[in-house]
Curated annotation (Swiss-Prot):
The chain crosses the membrane at residues 304-324. It comes from Pongo abelii (Sumatran orangutan). Residues 858-869 have a biased composition (Acidic residues). It is a single-pass type I membrane protein. Pfam families: FAM171A1-2-B_C, FAM171A1-2-B_N. Residues 747-757, 870-883 have a biased composition (Basic and acidic residues). Residues 822-833 have a biased composition (Polar residues). Belongs to the FAM171 family. GO terms for biological process: regulation of cell shape; stress fiber assembly. The modification Phosphoserine is found at S358, S360, S371, S422, S443, S525, S849, S855. The keyword Ribosomal protein does not apply. Its main location: membrane. Glycans are attached at N190, N194. This is Protein FAM171A1.
């Protein structure tokens, strides 16, 4: 059993093996042997071509080959499977190869195929030093096919020269000639091993060869430029790309090589291709790309796109330009709009002006627009006639802030105040009118007789010899000539009044007391002080910077100290006289057309030439107001201004104490600056200010300042920062606000009352003055006038009297308030008649001793020693310690 089973398995294996081997031996199962007759002839002469090579290709592989005989016929046998496509190719030397497909539907019994070979045309070979050119031998009007390449790319065989070379260039000029080229079936290899066959649509074809003498091809390396003209009926256009194909004789098919460009040469289109080698080339299009690959020039193909981009950019630039023009127009129109705002009616002007950095002028006291007062102001007092000179005295007063050198401070906001809308000072008539029912109120001219005391004051503030300063030496007041200049100025201002005192007899005690009583009334009642205390203290800090307001008046009368520099005031004394208003002397200004400018002055002989020179430069209209010569002025009783100056000089020789540190009521300032006091103060120094500031400023008008600051709580000037106040709103609602950091405390009635209470200690030194004050009724606070006190140059380090020491930069302009400290006489001519009537019986005032005059001059000389310490200050310190307040009448 085992043997029989093994035998069966062997037989089964043998049968399986035979079946497998039989299957493997018959791959072309169904293929039959077929004989094909091929006839080869000349395409141009139709003559048979002998010895032509015939090959049959299937799938790029040769399956059969043969040679034609003398009659050009060849019989080729091969195995053919039905459905396969064969390529029959015939080639011979000096002929363009040709091929044709063969694919029968059924297996034929007999089959014949004819192929015509196109003879290659000889070409003109031209070898240059750098280029080798091959041109078609047929020259004509139309462009000819041409090929050129670099000479160095030619590889000549051994024992071969250029004379042994033969060039052939054949181009298909018609569709029939294109058919003489091999069958146009292209093979597109994608580099992955997968190839696709395409039937090509030819455009043109060319064959180029370079042969040696024995007929072997000569190799050419490098780019070969092939140019072939196209048919006139071609549908191609300029800048079109057409695929180039190369014929491979080993594969019997066309291989894709690259792209050729179509150019326009006159009226003829040409196809140019850069070939890697010589051979058979055809320009044809494949079915995947049935049309030419057209690539137009960027200037024509992208014209619309480029125009759209340029149009968009132009539109954007136009919009930006319009925005820029609009912005510039608004910038240019802003100053005009601001100028138009300043021309608004009087009712809206003050509320429309800028409160922070505007350079416009807003009157400080009682100013009105010309529209409200079209004519000259007439000041009447209950039926009294208008006095001459009142119109000049009622000019608007302005606050200005200037640097010590005379230049405007451009970095500080400007503060402007107008009391034209305040309830307390609603009109000039209410301030200047004397109410008949209030008999205790007297005018400013009641202090002295009308015709004489005013001349005394004019003599004390008349022109003094100012030393000319160049603009670059504005801060160089510490020169050696400064001492003589300052001393001569003090002598000129103080000598007339002191000589007047020497000539005058003893004055009546009661008269002087009456003057001081009327001019500086006693403190108001406790009920009024309590009413002032009711003002909320938090109002000063409750508002933002843009809504701060200037109060309409100070809580209580304070001290008005006129000095050359705020920082020279002793801190201890400065706090004892709170609240105090310190005004630098060299910031007082007056208009050039004031009536008291050119009043003659009696001066020493050594100063007469300087004074006459300055007076000659004044305008002629000012010279005719006071034609009286100085020799006609008669001695008159000394004013209370001189008495106040004498108080200060006597106080400078004594040590200050809490009992005598406080100023008397004659040195106090009422609730706020009034027009009479300011007009009197400014009228005295107009001549000095106008000439001195023009000389010190180099003849150029000083720029307007931007802010003013007043410190009444004892702070030094360096601690007062810059800010601004909404001043206009203060006049309407009576707010008690002040600048956040100006140092002004408007709710300090206790210190003010203490200052008035302590003032009695100073007045005890002059009992005749106090007795006379008690005889006359007291004037209300609203009409009390300000006594300007000038703290002359007393050395600060040697005493604690609170006097100031002028800095070198301030000494040249300290004279601008000197006259204010010498006088408090009447500035309203309309009120001087009453003064004459009330003081006609008053005896002469006691003369001032020569010792007092020498003491004032010695104190000024001692002041120069302290000026040297100011040189060590940096420009920043000088800027931060500059004076706080300036008055200017415009």
């Amino acid at each position: 059993m085992s043997r029989s089973a093994a035998l069966l398995l062997c037989l089964l294996g043998c049968h399986v093996w035979k079946a497998v081997t039989k299957t493997l031996r018959e791959p072309g199962a169904g293929a039959q042997e077929v004989t094909l007759k091929v006839h080869i002839s000349d395409a141009s002469t139709h003559q048979p071509v002998a010895d032509a090579l015939i090959e049959i290709f299937t799938n790029q592989a040769s399956i059969a080959s043969g040679t034609s005989g003398t009659d050009g016929v060849a019989f080729i046998k091969f195995q053919y499977k039905l459905g396969s496509q064969l390529i029959v190719t015939a080639s011979k030397h000096a002929y363009v190869p040709n091929s044709a497909p063969w694919k029968p539907i059924r297996l034929p019994v007999f089959s014949s195929l004819s192929l015509g070979l196109l003879p290659e045309r000889s070409a003109t070979l031209m070898v240059y030093e750098d280029v080798v050119q091959i041109v078609s031998g047929f020259q004509g009007a139309r462009p000819q096919p041409r090929v050129h390449f670099q000479r160095r790319a030619l590889r000549l065989p051994e024992n071969t020269s250029y004379s042994d070379l033969t060039a052939f260039l054949t181009a298909a000029s018609s569709p029939s000639e294109v058919d003489s080229f091999p069958y146009l079936r292209g093979l597109d290899g994608n580099g992955t091993g997968n190839s696709t066959r395409h039937d090509l649509t030819p455009v043109t074809a060319v064959s180029v060869h370079l042969l040696s003498s024995n007929g072997t091809p000569v190799l050419v390396d490098g780019p070969i430029y092939v140019t072939v003209p196209l048919a006139t009926q071609s549908s191609l256009r300029h800048n079109a790309y057409v695929t180039a194909w190369r014929f491979d004789q080993k594969l019997g098919t066309w291989l894709k090589s690259g792209l050729g460009l179509v150019h326009q040469e006159g009226s003829q289109l040409t196809w140019t291709y850069i070939a890697p080698q010589l051979g058979y080339w055809v320009a044809a299009m494949s079915p995947p790309i049935p049309g030419p690959v057209v690539t137009q020039d960027i200037t024509t193909y992208h014209t619309v796109f480029l125009l759209a981009i340029l149009g968009g950019m132009a539109f954007i630039l136009l919009v930006l330009l319009c925005l820029l023009l609009y912005y510039c127009r608004r910038k240019c129109m802003k100053p005009r709009q601001h100028h138009r705002k300043l021309q608004l009616p009087a009712g809206l002007e003050s509320s429309k002006r800028d409160q922070s950095t505007s350079m416009s002028h807003i009157n400080l006291l009682f100013s009105r627009r010309a529209s409200e007062f079209p004519g000259p102001l007439s000041v009447t007092s209950h039926g009294r006639p208008e006095a001459p000179g009142t119109k000049e005295l009622m000019s608007g007063v302005h606050l200005e802030m200037m640097s010590p050198g005379g230049e405007g401070d451009l970095h500080t906001p400007m503060l402007k105040l107008s009391y034209s809308t305040s309830q307390e000072f609603s009109s000039r008539e209410e301030l200047l009118s004397c109410k008949e029912e209030d008999k205790s109120q007297i005018s400013f001219d009641n202090l002295t007789p009308s015709g004489t005391l005013r001349k005394d004051y004019h003599k004390s503030v008349e022109v003094f010899p100012l030393k000319a300063r160049k603009s670059m030496e504005r801060e160089g007041y510490e020169s050696s000539g400064n001492d003589d200049y300052r001393g001569s100025y003090n002598t000129v201002l103080s000598q007339p009044l002191f000589e007047k005192q020497d000539r005058e007899g003893p004055a009546s005690t009661g008269s002087k007391l009456t003057i001081q009583e009327h001019l500086y009334p006693a403190p108001s009642s406790p009920e009024k002080e309590q009413l002032l205390d009711r003002r909320p203290t938090e109002c000063m800090m409750s508002r933002s910077v843009d809504h701060l307001e200037r109060p309409t008046s100070f809580p209580q009368p304070g001290q008005l100290i006129c000095c050359s520099s705020v920082d020279q005031v002793n801190d201890s004394v400065y706090r004892k006289v709170l609240p105090a208003l310190v005004i630098p002397a060299h910031y007082m200004k007056l208009p050039g057309d004031h009536s008291y400018v050119s009043q003659p002055l009696v001066v020493p002989a050594d100063q007469q030439l300087e004074i006459e020179r300055l007076q000659a430069e004044l305008s002629n209209p000012h010279a005719g107001i006071f034609p009286h010569p100085s020799s006609q002025i008669q001695p008159q009783p000394l004013s209370s201004q001189a008495i106040s100056q004498q108080h200060l000089q006597d106080a400078g020789t004594r040590e200050w104490s809490p009992q005598n540190a406080s100023m008397s009521e004659s040195l106090s300032i009422p609730a706020s600056l009034n027009d009479a006091a300011l007009a009197q103060m400014n009228s005295e120094v107009q001549l000095l200010t106008e000439k001195a500031l023009m000389e010190l400023g180099g003849g150029k008008p000083l720029p307007h300042p931007r802010a003013w600051f007043v410190s009444l709580d004892g702070r030094s000037n360096a601690h007062v920062r810059h800010s601004y106040i909404d001043l206009q709103r203060a006049g309407r609602n009576g707010s008690n606000d002040a600048s956040l950091d100006s140092g002004v405390d408007m709710n300090e009635p206790k210190s003010a009352r203490k200052g008035r209470g302590d003032a009695l200690s100073l007045q005890q030194n002059y009992p005749p003055v106090q007795e006379h004050q008690q005889k006359e009724p007291r004037a209300p606070d609203s009409t009390a006038y300000t006594q300007l006190v000038y703290l002359d140059d007393v050395e600060q380090s040697g005493s604690e009297c609170g006097t100031t020491v002028c800095t070198p930069e301030d000494s040249a302009l300290r004279c601008l308030l000197e006259g204010s400290s010498r006088r408090s006489g009447g500035q309203l001519p309309s009120l001087q008649e009453e003064t004459t009537r009330r003081t006609a019986d008053a005896p002469s005032e006691p003369a001032v001793s020569p010792h007092q005059r020498r003491s004032a001059h010695e104190e000024e000389e001692d002041d120069d020693d302290d000026d040297q310490g100011e040189d060590k200050k940096s420009p920043w310190q000088k800027r931060e310690e500059r004076p706080l307040m300036a008055f200017n009448i415009k």
